[in-house]
Structures are given as structure tokens and as C-alpha cells.
Amino acid sequence: MADYHNNYKKNDELEFVRTGYGKDMVKVLHIQRDGKYHSIKEVATSVQLTLSSKKDYLHGDNSDIIPTDTIKNTVHVLAKFKGIKSIEAFGVNICEYFLSSFNHVIRAQVYVEEIPWKRLEKNGVKHVHAFIHTPTGTHFCEVEQLRSGPPVIHSGIKDLKVLKTTQSGFEGFIKDQFTTLPEVKDRCFATQVYCKWRYHQCRDVDFEATWGTIRDLVLEKFAGPYDKGEYSPSVQKTLYDIQVLSLSRVPEIEDMEISLPNIHYFNIDMSKMGLINKEEVLLPLDNPYGKITGTVKRKLSSRL
């Protein structure tokens, strides 16, 4: 029988690159009651902690470990006593708690995702306590803080599905013996936006308003003017245009990462049925799909 405890001792030829442990998908619904007017935040939170020692890994010594069940309970208690003004502020509260409460925690990383509830509204009148789930882009954030430094905050949008039926094309690409894709001047353009940005400072930032502004800018650049749209020669160009517009309009952010899958819709051939399909009936194709990514940041000279 293998002697696991004796065979796997500290190895001087190895070193840790990074360690962490925590609790994922801690779900909370926080209700703020101001008389009969109620406000809600529902979130899913994941917490990762890094400790100053590695004795739990090296020797199976658990004396420094904060149980992950305790981490879960802490998230619940912080929601009660701190509330959830924004998911970014909540993430900072969690990081600060673990770093200030446990001297051997040297790094805290928190991911928070907000479930998209929207208050019911009719004819300009907002309901006092009823909400509807509106999955038109998910707000998420990542907060990381080291013991020796301030929190670093990323915010983002994911699962924002958008489509336009014209004002998009793809021409002038490389053609070789394996190319079957024809050039096209007019096509459907559909994607599911993933967009993440970093704040260069966290004081006096209205995270909720900034997120809403960037979401509006993404939609503005994708769609173009409401009466005529805006032509996109490639997904790459649209991606970059979104980044340029966002960093020019939102001075609080330092960089932006975007991922845009190119979700295909193909014209269905009806010629065998004696019909001409003029891009009226299309076939959505989930897989495979193109994926275009890009990250930009402000040049150092632009920050001086």
C-alpha cells in the first residue's frame, strides 16, 4: 500500500505559484425597506483567500484555515449589516473584512454577479415592491486586494445579446485553397457581449451609474443612429469603436477588455421548393462561431 503521508513531503525543487481557497456561488437577496417602498439586490458571490502560510498544503495542518462555511456565513452577515449599495462596494466590504480580521490572510479576491431584476413600471408609475427579471446584460465585478495595497476593481457586462439585420458586412479577407466563405456587403450581425473594465481609482465612483453608461455606449456604437444605423465592416472594428467611445466618455476607467462571438444566421436555401428566399428566413447556427477579442488601455502619456 502506498504511504501517501511519507512520500509526499516538502519538495525543495518545487515552489508555489499561487494558492487560494474559498466559497463559490454564495447567493443572497438583500431587501432594503423604506416604509412601503422596497429595493432589492440579488447577487451570487465567490470568495477566494490566500494565506501567508502553506502548511495546509504541505503538512495537512488546518490550523490557519478559515472554513469555507464560515466564509459563506460572513457574506450573509455583511449583507445584513453593510447592505448592498452596489456589487462593487459589497466586494470591497468582503475583502476589507477578511484582511482586517485575520492577519494571516494576505490576499482576498471576490467575484460578484448581480441578478438582473427591474422594478415594475407602468405609465411612468413605479411599483413599490414588485420586480421583473430582465436578462438584458448581467452586471458583474471582480475585486482583489492585497494586504499591502488598495482594492483593484474590475466591473463588467456579460450575456448582453444584440442583433441587427443590416449595416454589416465582411470583405477583403485572405482567400486560399480552403476558403469557401463568400464576401458579403450586407448581413445580419449578432453577438453576445462580454465587456470588462478596470477603474484607476475607487473613491467617489458611482459604480451603478458608470455601468449603465457603458452599457448604453455599447448599444449606441453597435446599433448606430436609430433612423439609419451605422455600418460595421467587421466585428473587430465594432469592438474597437466601442472601446474608444467608452474610454473617451468615462474617465474613471483605465482599460477595457471585450469579447464578441460572431453568432451566425444563414439564409435558408429554398430553391428545391421553387422558392426564392431573399434573406427573409434565416437559420440560427449556434456552433461553430467566430470569436473576436481585444483589450485596450490608456497610454501612460494620456494620463500625465
UniProtKB/Swiss-Prot annotation:
Record: residues binding urate: 68-69, 170, 187, 235-236, 262
Protein's pathway: Purine metabolism; urate degradation; (S)-allantoin from urate: step 1/3
Any single GO CC term annotated in Swiss-Prot or TrEMBL for this entry: peroxisome
Enzyme Commission numbers on file: 1.7.3.3
SUPFAM superfamilies from the UniProt entry: Tetrahydrobiopterin biosynthesis enzymes-like (SSF55620)
Active site residues per record: 23, 68, 264
PANTHER family per record: URICASE
Record function comment: Catalyzes the oxidation of uric acid to 5-hydroxyisourate, which is further processed to form (S)-allantoin.
Protein name as it appears in the record: Uricase
Lineage: Eukaryota, Metazoa, Chordata, Craniata, Vertebrata
Protein encoded by which gene: UOX
